[in-house]
Amino acid sequence: MKVAIVTKINCKSCINIARIIISALPSDWDIIYEKSLARAIKKPGLEINEINADIIIVIGGDGTILRTAQFAHGNILGINVGGLGFLSEIEIGNIEASILKLIRNEYTIIEYMGLDVYVNGVYSGKAINDAVIHTDKVSKIRKFRLYENNYFIETTSADGVIVATPIGSTSYSFSAGGPILMPNLNGIVVSYIAPVGFRSRSIVFSEKTDLKIAIVGERSLLTIDGQIEKKLSKNDVVNIRVSENGARFISMYTNFYEKLREKLIKDVVN
């Protein structure tokens, strides 16, 4: 079994957790380390885009997990250090019990849908959570023209537009008033950030949709999973479609609703 360990950059507590995990893993497992962690523990390491493993243990927040999903190859197991950590499966208090489950193969592997993003026909990256087109200046709105399979839908004035996967529908899109999609639904959610007027609501498209968003007016920014950023100019066109390959995550929850209750709706009485 080949296991890679990735930690949030400049996170001392993450390094301490990594040491605990390293000591708990079977001695016959092959462990590789992402370079920033490797430097801290004085081990040989790999750049994140060089990592290819059976399991990738990621210690940090959702940003670290998305960075790993963007560049590394393997089944991702997230350990939450800090924030909400919706993409994580393990909290700090149950690390040892969860690693024991990992060793015993007491988990499932879920593949989350991804989105391929193109700007003017040139591939720009893959989104596991979302692709966001937003204004490049505070308090400035932009116009976005939306098409499905080259059929014009609407032109909307807003601070931005979010195109989310099912797992990404629990993130920025949800905060913007969008619906939550179950991970097995394979739909695409389009939500606007602070739209002008009451008509602009979230739209759910099928996985066969080729979305096109044309930038009307001034410059904007494209952000993919918060990891890749690209400047957009007037009349630039962003195409987004479902990727052939998403990202594989290790799950230790009984079902998605259990995770939803724990991470997003903690006030619900069970």
Swiss-Prot record:
Keywords: ATP-binding, Cytoplasm, Kinase, NAD, NADP, Nucleotide-binding, Transferase. It catalyses: NAD(+) + ATP = ADP + NADP(+) + H(+). InterPro entries: ATP-NAD_kinase_N, ATP-NAD_kinase_PpnK-typ_C, NAD/diacylglycerol_kinase_sf, NADK. It holds the Pfam family NAD_kinase. It comes from the Archaea. It is found in: Cytoplasm. The active site is at D62 (proton acceptor). One of its GO terms (cellular component) is cytoplasm. Its EC number is 2.7.1.23. The keyword ATP-binding applies. NAD(+) binds at residues 62-63, 67, 129-130, 140, 159, 167, 170-175, 194, 227. It is an enzyme of class 2 (transferase). HAMAP family: NAD_kinase (MF_00361). Belongs to the NAD kinase family. Involved in the regulation of the intracellular balance of NAD and NADP, and is a key enzyme in the biosynthesis of NADP. Catalyzes specifically the phosphorylation on 2'-hydroxyl of the adenosine moiety of NAD to yield NADP. This is NAD kinase. The gene is nadK.
